[in-house]
Structures are given as C-alpha cells and as structure tokens.
C-alpha cells in the first residue's frame, strides 16, 4: 500500500497557528501525501527543544528572547514561514495606565512611565516585554527605566484596583475588564504594528533528511493560510479545523477579532531584526553580537512552494 509521509508537528493551542490546523483539517496535507502527527506543547521554548533534537519536525513558535538564545547556541532549526502577525492598526494588545495617574497629569505619555511599576505577563524576554521595550525606546527610555512586574493577565485588574501597579501591557478580555472597571485607561496601542511575533520552524533533521517532504509541507501550509484570508476566516470548514486544536468555542472565535496571516506566509526579516535588537539592548539575550540571518531563517521552502502555487488571488 502507498504510505503517507509522517511529519511530527509541535503546536501551542492558540489561533496564531491556524494555517496549520486548516491545512490538516481541509486535507491540503493529504493532497501533498503528508500525514501530520500533532503534538501539543506548553510553550514555543519547549517546541524548539524538540526541533533541535530532531524528535519533532515542525513547530509553531512565538518569538521570545529564548528563541534568539537558541539560535545563538547553534540550535539546528530555522524559521521557514510567518504565523500570525500583529495588526497594522487597532491591535488588541495595549498599554493601560492607572486612571488616577492620567487624570492628575502625572502620566500623559509612555515617557512618563519612568520609575513606575509596569506589569507584563511572563516578565522579561517575552513578546509582551518586547512591545513595552519598543514603546519605551521610541520615547527615549529603556526597559531599565521602569520597574517591571511579572503578573498573570487575570490578576491585573485587582492590581489596578489596589493601586499596586501603575501600568500594564494587556490584551482582551482583560484589557476591556480593566477599562470597564473604571480604574485603568488606554495609554498606548500598536507598539509594533505588523510585527511577526509568531513563526513556523523546521528542524535541521527534516531539512537535511527530507527536503522534498519539507517543500510539500510548505505548499499545504501556504494553502492553509490562503484559505482563511478575509471573510473566508469564518468558513465552516475552517471553524471546524480551528476547534479541533484550539481550546475555544465557535461563538468566541466568531466574536473575537480574526488573526492576521500573510497569504504567502512571508517571513518579515526586518521584524526579526528589530525584535532581536530590542531583546539584546535589554540584556535579555545571553550574547551581545547580532546573529547572522542565515543562522535563523531559511526562505527556500516558501520560495519553492510559491513557484508551485503561483501568486495569491484574493
């Protein structure tokens, strides 16, 4: 009998990796003669460890300081495609400040957060910390100018109510609850418009030992992204695919704002460079010299896939 090529994929159960869910659910992988063995992991850091060891082939990963530390150590893996991108404007992640500070005029802008307590879920080196560090840099400050508090998102509302924090980086539904509760107001939004904060990676083993499979996987993955553009995002076949892998409800997905994906899953190099630079300047990486692009990224699979698929037609 004809057997399918098996590819083991690590994923964190969030909508950022929707093209993969759809590529499987709508049989684009099967069309490419691939069977995907999905392995749920707790974090991108965990996924990268498996990829570096070659025990898993593909991973959906959020970029953090740990990502760059792994590349610096020479981990055998590469970014091959973008996953969800930050919106160009009206992004869900915002910086909220205590209403009393805004009302009194003590905090009018990001620059006024100097010396103040700012809560970020997960603390230093996270994607959230990147947003805050980038906003501070643009205001002429560094992350060292604030007191960072590592606080889980659900705990932030109470911290605002008690006056235990001055500001926080937070997203829905918590941001809406804090503002709705009257103790916090919006200070900044769209700190990194269009940023590529989540990516798909291949293991060195897959690239070296099965380059053909890696290329076919990419064809299916890009088809998955193209199938969820614009209004198609909520097609019933897509919803069914999302719900197989994400802990959510159809209602919540319909109500929530759609994640943004490049139809070609293009890798945004300037985005990677900017994140790496900000993480380095904040001393969240354990090295000081920029990592060469070819040690982090391999664009050849997407390029080959696009030759087969042709340009995206909305």
Residue ranges, per PLM feature:
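Secondary-structure end/capping motifs
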Residues: 208-289
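Short secondary-structure boundary/hinge segments and terminal tails
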Residues: 41, 47, 69, 88, ...
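Short amphipathic alpha-helical segments at helix boundaries and their inter-helical linkers
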Residues: 55-58, 161-165, 258-274, 303-311
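Short, glycine-/small- and polar/acidic-enriched structural segments
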Residues: 2-150, 166-172, 185-194
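Sec-exported extracytoplasmic/periplasmic mature domains
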Residues: 25, 52, 56, 72, ...
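Extracytoplasmic/secreted envelope proteins and their assembly/folding machinery
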Residues: 17, 21, 48, 64-67, ...
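Conserved C-terminal helix/tail region of periplasmic/extracytoplasmic solute-binding proteins
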Residues: 277-314
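Pocket-lining segment of extracytoplasmic ligand-binding domains
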Residues: 154-244
């Amino acid at each position: 009998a004809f057997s399918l090529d098996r590819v083991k994929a690590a994923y964190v159960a969030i909508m950022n990796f929707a093209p993969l869910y759809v590529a499987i659910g709508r049989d684009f992988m099967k069309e490419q003669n691939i069977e995907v063995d999905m392995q749920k992991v707790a974090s991108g850091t965990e996924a990268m460890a498996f990829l570096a060891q070659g025990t898993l082939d593909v991973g959906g990963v959020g970029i953090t300081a740990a990502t760059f530390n792994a590349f610096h150590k020479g981990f055998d893996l590469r970014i091959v495609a973008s996953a969800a991108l930050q919106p160009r404007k009206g992004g869900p992640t915002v910086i909220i400040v205590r209403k009393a500070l805004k009302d009194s005029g003590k905090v009018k802008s990001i620059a006024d957060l100097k010396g103040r307590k700012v809560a970020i879920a997960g603390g230093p080196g996270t994607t959230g910390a990147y947003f805050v560090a980038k906003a501070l840099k643009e205001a002429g400050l560094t992350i060292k100018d604030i007191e960072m508090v590592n606080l889980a998102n659900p705990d932030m509302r109470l911290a605002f109510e008690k006056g235990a924090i001055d500001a926080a980086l937070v997203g829905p539904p918590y941001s809406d609850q804090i503002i709705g509760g009257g103790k916090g107001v919006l200070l900044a939004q769209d700190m990194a418009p269009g940023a590529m904060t989540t990516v798909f990676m291949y293991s060195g083993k897959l690239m070296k030992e099965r380059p053909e499979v890696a290329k076919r996987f990419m064809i299916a993955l890009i088809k998955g992204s193209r199938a969820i553009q614009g209004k198609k995002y909520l097609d019933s076949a897509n919803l069914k695919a999302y719900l197989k892998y994400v802990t959510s409800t159809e209602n919540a997905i319909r109500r929530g704002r759609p994640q943004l994906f490049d139809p070609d899953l293009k890798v945004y190099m300037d985005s990677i460079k900017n994140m790496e630079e900000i993480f380095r300047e904040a001393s969240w990486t354990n090295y000081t010299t920029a990592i060469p692009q070819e040690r982090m990224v391999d664009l050849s699979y997407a390029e080959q896939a696009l030759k087969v698929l042709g340009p995206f037609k909305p």
